């Protein structure tokens, strides 16, 4: 029984020597030779043995990790009677233990709901077993420490003891195998006449040392290779050396051999670097970690440092380098990319390497959490926990597991969208609404529904879809909730979930997905679907095995299962025979690599800026170790580990080493280079840093040609270069050659034409063909005023809404338009109620105004937006505030009526084919016509002598005024149109002709009076009346004005209308008035605008042409902004800037342009 240690720096030939030595021994005897290497290294070592000619295909040799050797020996000696717990199972059991002890925890009670907490606890328990630290020892070490550390250890002790109790000596963790292995080695016949070779470790845990000790006793020989600096073991341990851990392992092995009485053969020390093929790489590896500064005198060969603008530029530069190395004769398997933060680069690398046609293996396990099956389970449980809220329900729906498996996915998705729209619009946010008896009723009504017509065929069809999809969700989910609510034990909870998955045909759906992915060539995706089911099956089996008989509640079950779901990962396929490997630096176990790219070499990353992580902080660890705890040292006491990691990278390649870093992150934040790069540049005076550019145009032609490495990737660069050429920059002939190369075969030319077409892209629309326009809008255009205003705001906005009939998804929320409808509805209801009771405005008391407003709100509240005003306490408060506004408006209108001769003669008057008044007909080109239809809020009439006046009142929830500029540009046609219609149809409406008296906006709001001193009730009333003054435009006729405000005196301004009388009895310039002739011109001009719009619509006008008036644009509140893609930075997308001109100028233009109809 002997021990031999092989020691030396990386690349000195230790592994090669061991393999060659075993190869020679196999020829001479029949012994078994067992290599033990780290878990991540077994595949590479097996590959190396297969490629080693003198080992005859591995006959007589076996490759194990410590855990795989444990399985082998325990299978032989009978130590596998206990159930193995995976990492997922461990975290679930720890969560159960923590939940059971939650009330007793002093410091971790809140952490029990923190994501990652159980993973950290699992890592701590793993460390305790590896380092053979008992919980009793830890408690003892913490006795004299701070309250914080004491409380932490107290909580850990409670959780750990409960955890061990739940395992109940029936289950095994990975670390338990090493303990059992150490116990069973002596009983193994397999290990008789064997020699053990241990390679690839930089240090050993206490458990591993115990196993090695037993192997020393059992096996003929144990040979162990260690990477260290030979002079250090000859001159004693250096606390700050990067080889500290290896040197400690060296002394520990010698001590172990001494304790076991094992003979120590003469150690072999390897000093010469045999891996590096260039003097510069050998120098870098040999001098790394030396205290004495040494510099390299010549220009370094095959050692490069690159800066990149950002991470994408860095990866694209590396992809070009890899393509060049492949052209130079290297295989992809000879190349590896290493990074400290794989999460910063994995997705980017995958995308870029695919574009450069570089086969790449990303050595990173991906979490299963985003797989639809895992999301379905989690969302289903969340839906039950949170009373069937919208978010978890539809997260589950969108995974498609509720759908009928026999129907097409696209059809099911469409039906699910219809259901989702209904749920959002109707505010279905709880279980009671989902499970309520009877079908859900579908009505395509938005806003106020006071007059509900019978359902249409379309509504009945939509209703059947909604209820079909509703039942697909409610039936299985209700059953799941029922079974979960009845469950008491872990077994019953697991069965409830399993039966739910059976009910939705989860296995069949995953299998159909797997088959489809396989048929389409997505083999990795097919494996993921397969693993998803097997992982959930294993998780439930493990859950039942450990917690099946435990009493649980629903919250505990979902938390524990949630922990298990978080821990699930997809297993990795080993890399193919010829792929570039992308791996993280710390876990990479690579052999025989010729070219290494170390990326992301930034300050704070290499060396890592240490942060506390895990259950114990660095300070906690230092304190516990000071009390003889055997926990691992804190990060700050492992100063040499960062140097060792860097050493591992720079000593890995035999041929070439590329080091790179980005100068900025994705957000443009500046990133500095690593201190290690500064150190290397200091050692190599002739080493020049290069730059990976996003724009190579400033480089020489030869350098620019290096950017052309693959057809797909080059096409993007070519596009950007041609874009610069369009702007007047010089273009290298390199890019013209690249351009021509794309048109040498048909397939590439098609791809190139598609991509390069973006050079000439303009975000413009073409006019619709005449037949298309007529099919969309009809030969007779039935339009509303607001639709025409939308056309003049932006033609494309009109096309999207009225041509394509796009509309925003409805939401169960009270919007400004809904409040406007409530105000209109209230005023209509109150006016109608007054008429029914033979009452008139101006004759009501304040109390009657309040009562009328209250009755109106009681009538309207259930009829707005699916009873939204009755849906919550918050909505009840909003209803109260709306009632205040309606009450105030009723009071003001009543007060105004006392001073006015005008009285309503029409409320909510419809005009159109089925209206009280016929539509406004506008003749269009080609014998077409435009029929204008709509509803007028209120029409008032007043008479004096033989003159009759009509005016329009419009209720607004925000402040409005009539701007002639907006009328001229077609943005505010409503009021003058309504006035034109009522004046034109006065004979039909009131039996006589009438004059236009004006158009006025009544602002419905709850006014407040601001004053610097206390005011009387009368003064307050006066101020409130002023703030309620209507805005708009009125007839500049003393008779009409006096009828509107009979209290108006000379030298005073009206508190009702926008009028002011001078001392001489004339209207002042501050009045907002127009003459009868001007009103007629405006009415005529408005008709002209409708004719203009109608003809343009028939001509197919769909331009993206939003206006800009002052700072206002229709894009601010446009639902179609993302759809049209309007971008003012593009030459093809510019606003129509509208001039804000004086009223006199506008009226003159209207007169000139209005013409005659």
Curated annotation (Swiss-Prot):
GO terms for molecular function: 3'-5' DNA helicase activity; 4 iron, 4 sulfur cluster binding; 5'-3' exonuclease activity; ATP binding; double-stranded DNA binding; metal ion binding. Its EC number is 3.1.-.-. It comes from the Bacteria. Binds 1 [4Fe-4S] cluster. NCBIfam families: addB_Gpos. The heterodimer acts as both an ATP-dependent DNA helicase and an ATP-dependent, dual-direction single-stranded exonuclease. Recognizes the chi site generating a DNA molecule suitable for the initiation of homologous recombination. The AddB subunit has 5' -> 3' nuclease activity but not helicase activity. PANTHER family: RECBCD ENZYME SUBUNIT RECC. This is ATP-dependent helicase/deoxyribonuclease subunit B. It comes from Listeria monocytogenes serovar 1/2a (strain ATCC BAA-679 / EGD-e). The gene is addB.
């Amino acid at each position: 029984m002997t021990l031999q240690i092989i020691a030396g720096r990386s690349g000195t030939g230790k592994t090669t020597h061991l393999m060659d030595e075993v190869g020679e021994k196999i020829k001479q005897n029949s012994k078994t030779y067992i290599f033990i290497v780290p878990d991540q290294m077994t595949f590479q070592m097996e590959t190396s043995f297969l490629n080693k000619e003198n080992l005859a295909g591995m006959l007589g040799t076996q490759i194990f990790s410590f855990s795989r050797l444990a399985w082998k020996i325990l299978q032989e000696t009978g130590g596998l009677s206990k159930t193995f717990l995976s990492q997922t199972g461990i975290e679930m059991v720890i969560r159960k233990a923590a939940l059971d002890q939650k009330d007793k925890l002093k410091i971790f009670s809140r952490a029990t709901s923190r994501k990652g907490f159980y993973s950290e606890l699992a890592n701590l328990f793993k460390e305790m077993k590896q380092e053979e630290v008992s919980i009793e020892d830890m408690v003892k070490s913490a006795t004299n420490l701070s309250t914080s550390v004491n409380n932490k250890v107290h909580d850990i002790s409670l959780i750990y003891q409960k955890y061990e109790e739940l395992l109940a000596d029936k289950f095994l963790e990975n670390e338990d195998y090493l303990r059992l292995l150490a116990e069973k080695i002596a009983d193994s016949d397999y290990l008789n006449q064997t020699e053990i070779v241990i390679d690839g470790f930089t240090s050993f845990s206490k458990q591993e040392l115990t196993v090695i000790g037993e192997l020393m006793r059992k096996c003929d020989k144990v040979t162990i290779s260690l990477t260290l600096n030979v002079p250090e073991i000859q001159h004693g341990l250096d606390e700050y050396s990067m080889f500290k851990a290896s040197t400690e392992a060296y002394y520990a092995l010698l001590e172990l051999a001494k304790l076991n009485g094992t003979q120590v053969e003469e150690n072999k020390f390897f000093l010469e670097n045999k891996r590096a093929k260039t003097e510069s790489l050998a120098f870098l590896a040999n001098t790394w970690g030396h205290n004495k500064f040494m510099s390299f005198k010549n220009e370094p060969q095959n050692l490069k440092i690159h800066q990149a603008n950002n991470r994408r530029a860095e990866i694209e530069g590396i992809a070009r380098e890899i393509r060049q190395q492949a052209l130079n004769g290297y295989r992809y398997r000879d190349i590896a990319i290493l990074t400290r933060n794989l999460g910063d680069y994995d997705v980017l690398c995958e995308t870029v390497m695919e574009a450069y046609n570089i086969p790449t293996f990303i050595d990173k396990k991906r979490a299963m959490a985003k797989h639809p099956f895992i999301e379905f389970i989690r969302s289903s449980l969340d839906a039950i926990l949170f009373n069937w809220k919208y978010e978890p329900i539809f997260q589950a729906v969108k995974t498609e597991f509720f759908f009928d498996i026999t129907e097409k996915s696209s059809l099911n998705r469409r039906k699910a969208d219809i259901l989702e729209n209904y749920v959002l619009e109707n505010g279905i946010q709880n279980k009671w609404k989902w499970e309520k008896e009877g079908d859900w009723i579908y009505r395509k009504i938005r806003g106020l529904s006071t007059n509900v017509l019978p359902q249409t065929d379309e509504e009945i069809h939509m209703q059947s879809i909604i209820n079909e999809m509703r039942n697909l969700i409610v039936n299985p989910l209700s059953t799941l909730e029922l079974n979960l609510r009845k469950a008491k034990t872990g077994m019953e909870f697991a069965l409830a979930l399993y039966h739910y998955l059976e009910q939705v045909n989860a296995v069949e759906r995953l299998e159909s997905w797997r088959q489809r992915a396989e048929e389409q060539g997505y083999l990795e995706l097919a494996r993921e679907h397969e693993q998803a089911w097997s992982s959930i099956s294993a998780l439930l089996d493990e859950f039942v095995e450990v917690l099946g008989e435990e009493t649980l509640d629903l919250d505990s079950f979902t938390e524990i299962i949630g922990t298990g779901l978080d821990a699930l990962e997809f297993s990795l396929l080993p890399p193919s025979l010829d792929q570039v490997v992308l791996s993280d630096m710390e876990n990479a176990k690579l052999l025989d690599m010729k070219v290494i790219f170390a990326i992301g070499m930034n300050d704070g990353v290499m060396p890592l800026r240490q942060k506390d992580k895990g259950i114990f902080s660095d300070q906690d660890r230092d304190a516990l170790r000071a009390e003889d705890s055997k926990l691992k040292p804190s990060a700050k006491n492992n100063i040499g580990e960062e140097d060792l990691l860097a050493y591992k990278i720079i000593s890995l390649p035999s041929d070439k080493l590329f080091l790179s870093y980005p100068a900025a992150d994705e957000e443009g934040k500046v990133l500095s280079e690593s201190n290690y790069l500064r150190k290397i540049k200091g050692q190599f005076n002739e080493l020049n840093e290069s730059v990976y550019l996003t724009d190579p145009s400033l480089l020489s032609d030869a350098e620019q040609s290096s950017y052309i490495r693959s057809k797909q990737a080059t096409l993007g660069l070519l596009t950007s270069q041609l874009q610069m050429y369009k702007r007047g920059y010089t273009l290298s002939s390199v890019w013209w050659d690249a351009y021509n190369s794309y048109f040498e075969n048909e397939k590439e030319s098609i791809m190139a034409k598609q991509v390069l077409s973006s050079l000439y892209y303009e975000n413009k629309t073409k006019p619709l063909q005449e037949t298309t326009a007529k099919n969309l809008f009809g030969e007779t255009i039935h339009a509303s005023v607001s639709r025409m205003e939308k056309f003049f705001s932006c033609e494309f906005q009109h096309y999207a809404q009225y041509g394509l009939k796009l509309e925003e998804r409805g939401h169960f929320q009270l919007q400004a338009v809904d409040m406007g409808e409530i105000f209109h509805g209230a005023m209509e209801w109150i006016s109608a109620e007054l008429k029914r009771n033979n009452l008139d405005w101006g004759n009501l008391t304040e109390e009657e105004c309040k009562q009328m407003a209250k009755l109106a709100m009681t009538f309207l509240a259930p009829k707005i937006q699916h009873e939204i005003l009755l849906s919550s306490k918050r909505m009840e408060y909003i209803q109260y505030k709306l009632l205040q506004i309606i009450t105030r408006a009723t009071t003001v209108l009543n007060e105004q009526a006392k001073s006015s001769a005008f009285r309503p003669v029409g409320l909510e008057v419809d005009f159109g084919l089925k209206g009280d008044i016929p539509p406004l007909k506008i003749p269009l080109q080609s014998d077409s016509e435009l029929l204008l239809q709509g509803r007028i809020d209120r029409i008032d009439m007043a008479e004096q002598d033989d003159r009759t006046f009509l005016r329009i009142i419009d209720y607004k929830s925000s402040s409005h005024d009539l701007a002639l500029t907006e009328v001229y540009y077609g943005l505010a046609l409503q009021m003058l149109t309504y006035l034109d219609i009522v004046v034109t149809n006065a004979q039909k409406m009131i039996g006589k002709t009438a004059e236009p008296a004006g158009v006025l906006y009544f602002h419905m709001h709850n006014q407040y009076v601001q004053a610097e001193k206390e005011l009387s009730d009368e003064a307050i009333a006066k101020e409130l009346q002023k703030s309620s003054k209507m805005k708009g435009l009125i007839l500049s006729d003393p008779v009409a004005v006096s009828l509107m405000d009979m209290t108006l005196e000379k030298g005073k301004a009206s508190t009702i209308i926008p009028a002011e009388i001078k001392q001489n009895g004339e209207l002042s310039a501050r009045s907002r008035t127009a003459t009868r002739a001007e009103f007629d011109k405006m009415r005529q001009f408005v008709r002209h605008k409708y004719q203009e719009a109608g003809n343009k619509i028939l001509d197919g006008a769909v331009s993206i042409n939003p206006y800009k008036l002052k700072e206002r644009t229709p894009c601010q509140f446009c639902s179609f902004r993302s759809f049209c893609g309007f971008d003012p930075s593009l030459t093809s997308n510019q606003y129509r800037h509208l001039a804000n001109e004086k009223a006199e100028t506008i009226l003159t233009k209207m007169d000139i342009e209005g013409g005659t109809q």
